[in-house]
Amino acid sequence: MAMSSYMVNSKYVDPKFPPCEEYSQNNYIPEQGSDYYSSSQDTDFQHPGIYPRSNYTEQPFGCTAVQEPTVPRGHVHDKSGQPSPFNAQTESGAPVLVAGPRTCGQQQNTKSQNGTQAKQPAVVYPWMKKVHVTTVNPDYTGSEPKRSRTAYTRQQVLELEKEFHFNRYLTRRRRIEIAHTLCLSERQIKIWFQNRRMKWTKDHKLPNTKGRSAPASSHLQSIHKDQTDITSL
C-alpha cells in the first residue's frame, strides 16, 4: 500500500525494473521506514494552517441568477426539492416551442408546395381547342362535311351583277366595300365573282389562246429553217 502511494505521488517517471519477485528473494530492495514516505508526501502536501482556503462560492450559469447554497467538494447535493427556473417559466408562461430539425419528408413537402404556388396555369388559346361533333351522324364517312351553299337574295344578286358589268375583277378594297354594303363576307364575294367569270367565259366561247400560239410558233420555226438553208447555199 505504501509502495503504490509513493509511485502515485512521486514526481519522477516510473522506471522499468525486472519483476519484483527476484528482488524480493535476493533482498535487493531494502525496507524503508515510514519517515521516508512521509517526507516525500510532505513536499506536495500544503498545510491548511499555512495556506488557508479562500471562501469561494460557486455561482451556476443559467437564464436567471439563482444562488444555490455552497456544497463542500466530494458531496452530492440533491436538487429534487428545489424547482428549476426553466420549469417555473414554462409553467407560469406560454409553452416554449423549440423548432427541431426538419426531416426529409417535411423538406420535400415544402419544396412541392412552393413549386405548385410558383407554377401558373397554362393558357389555352382558341386555336388549341378541338371542335367535337355533338350529334352522331350514321351516314358520316369520315370526310369533312360540305359547306352549305350561300343563298343570295335578289337584291344582292342585282348589285353583284351591276358591279360585274363594270369590273369583272375586283380589288381587295372594293371587295371589302361591297361585302360591307351587302352584309356578306369577302370570301362569298370572291367565290361569286369566280363563278360569274367562268359562266361569262362559257357563254361567250372565247377561243383558246394556247391553241393559237402553237401554230404560230411552228410557222416561225419553218421560216427560220428556210433562212438557214438559204445561207448554207
From Swiss-Prot:
InterPro entries documented for this protein: Antp_homeobox_Deformed_sf, HD, HD_metazoa, Homeobox_antennapedia, Homeobox_Antennapedia_CS, Homeodomain-like_sf
Organism domain of life: Eukaryota
Compositionally biased spans, kind Basic and acidic residues: 223-233
Annotated keywords: Developmental protein, DNA-binding, Homeobox, Nucleus, Transcription, Transcription regulation
Subcellular location: Nucleus
Biological source species: Takifugu rubripes
Family statement: Belongs to the Antp homeobox family. Deformed subfamily.
A single MF term (Gene Ontology): RNA polymerase II cis-regulatory region sequence-specific DNA binding
DNA-binding region positions on the chain: 145-204
Renumbered residue ranges of the record's region Disordered: 203-233
Task of the protein: Sequence-specific transcription factor which is part of a developmental regulatory system that provides cells with specific positional identities on the anterior-posterior axis.
Motif (Antp-type hexapeptide): 124-129
Name of the protein in question: Homeobox protein Hox-D4a
Any one GO BP annotation for this protein: anterior/posterior pattern specification
This protein's record includes keyword Transcription: yes
Gene designation: hoxd4a
Any one of the GO CC terms: nucleoplasm
Principal subcellular localization: nucleus
PANTHER family (UniProt xref): HOMEOBOX PROTEIN HOX-D4, HOMEOTIC PROTEIN DEFORMED
